[in-house]
Amino acid sequence: NRLAACFPETEVLPCGTALIRKARSVKTEIEIEMFRRSGIAHAKAYEQIPSVYRPGMTDRQLSIEIERLMRLEGCLGIFRTFGQSMEIFMGSLLAGDNATAPAPYDFALGGEGLDPSLPISVNGALLQPGQSFMVDMGGNFYGYMGDMSRVFSIGKLPEKAYVAHQVCLDIQEAVVEKAKPGAVCEDFYNLAIDIVTKAGFADNFMGATQKAKFIGHGIGLEINEMPVLAPRMKQELEPGMVFALEPKIVLLGIGPVGIENSWVVTAEGVEKLTLCKEEIVEL
C-alpha cells in the first residue's frame, strides 16, 4: 500500500509477486552472460575436488574443502531462495545412504545434516570405499545462481551404479533434445518418468523415502525460479529462460548418482552453462 501511494496514477494489480516471477523467468543478454561467467568459475572449482580429497575424511571435512574452493574461485557464499521457510548454506554433499534422508524443503535430495535443527547435507560420517557422493553446490558468483551436481566415488562402485548414472545422462539427453521454445514444462517430467521406469529405477528416482516431484527448476537471482519442470506445469519454454535439469537416482548401500546442469533456452534449443565432465569421477 505504501508503494502504491507513491504512484497514485498507476493501477495496482493483485498477485504482484507472481507477475514479477513470470517476468524474471526470461533473462536479458547481460544476465545470461553472468550465468556463462558463473558456469566457468563453478566448473573450475569442481575440477579441483579430487585434489582436496584425502582418505579418512568425513563428508563434512570434504564439504568444507569444496566450499573453500568455491570461495577461492569467487563464489559469494550466499544461497538465495524464493520463500522465507527455505534455507541452506552454499549447497550439499551427500554420501552413501545419507542421500536417502528426505529433504525438509523442495530439494531433489536431502541428507540428515549435522544437527536436527538443520536436517540437510552432510552428517559427519566417514567417506567409505565403494560409496558414491554427490556434490551439489549453488554457484552464486555474479549474483546469479548457477546449479551443478557431479558424482564422485571412493574406489570402484557396483556396476548397478554406473548403469543408473547412465540412465540419468540418457534422461538429460532426451530432455535437451526436446527443449525448444514452445515446449511444455510438464512434458519433460513425463519423459523422464517414462525413461527411468523402462530402465527399472523408478523406485529410486528423485529420492528414496521421499521423492521430489520435479526434474528441473528455473534459476536466477534465486535458486528456485520459474519455469519448473514438473507435473501439471503448462508453462512453455521461451528464449532467455534459464533452468537447472537434475535427474538423480539414489541407490541404497551405494549412494546417489545422476547429473545436474544449468541451461539457457535459445531460439533453436538450449545452451549448456555448466561445462564440467559428467562421468562418475573415481577418487
Predicted regions, residues:
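Active-site neighborhoods and metal-handling regions in enzymes and metal-associated proteins
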Residues: 1-283
